[in-house]
Amino acid sequence: MPRAPRTYSKTYSTPKRPYESSRLDAELKLAGEFGLKNKREIYRISFQLSKIRRAARDLLTRDEKDPKRLFEGNALIRRLVRVGVLSEDKKKLDYVLALKVEDFLERRLQTQVYKLGLAKSVHHARVLITQRHIAVGKQIVNIPSFMVRLDSEKHIDFAPTSPFGGARPGRVARRNAARKAEASGEAAEEAEDEE
């Protein structure tokens, strides 16, 4: 049976003015602070944020007792609280408009791994994640931009299959251990020969 073609939608939008120096400096600072690979990661989050803010603005124009505003507004706020972008004491649509890109970047797995002290830097955190050393609960996650929910935050740890999580050491560590054992074995033989 023929399958319908899948339509893809754009996940980011580039800035209208490509060489605005103040924006370029701000993006570079963000990319360095959160260990991002490229500017597209910033554009993707700002695109998501703009869609969320647009929805909040649309709902704020409606009457407070409007069923659509009540239903969709609560759903939007609940989703943002679950991800941890919006705090429990700020459950109003006005606070949704005050959200910044940094609030979303804070919730990335890469940032959370660094904040929990599992990595020496945000860049090291990215390497650990892409090399499948990090698990959220029982699931290995190898996507640095994975959005960590509030209830999943306490389950971030090294994967059970990772050498950092107590599994079999890596290839280089095994080779070094074998060399060390071989060297200590030779030293013991030489000591026996001298006696």
UniProtKB/Swiss-Prot annotation:
Domain of life the protein comes from: Eukaryota
SUPFAM superfamilies: Alpha-L RNA-binding motif
Entry's family note: Belongs to the universal ribosomal protein uS4 family.
InterPro entries xref list: Ribosomal_uS4 (IPR022801), Ribosomal_uS4_CS (IPR018079), Ribosomal_uS4_euk/arc (IPR005710), Ribosomal_uS4_N (IPR001912), S4_RNA-bd (IPR002942), S4_RNA-bd_sf (IPR036986)
Domain S4 RNA-binding: 107-181
Gene name tied to this protein: RPS9B
Source lineage: Eukaryota, Fungi, Dikarya, Ascomycota, Saccharomycotina
Protein species of origin: Saccharomyces cerevisiae (strain ATCC 204508 / S288c) (Baker's yeast)
CDD domains: S4
Intracellular or extracellular location(s): Cytoplasm; Nucleus, Nucleolus
Name used for this protein in its record: Small ribosomal subunit protein uS4B
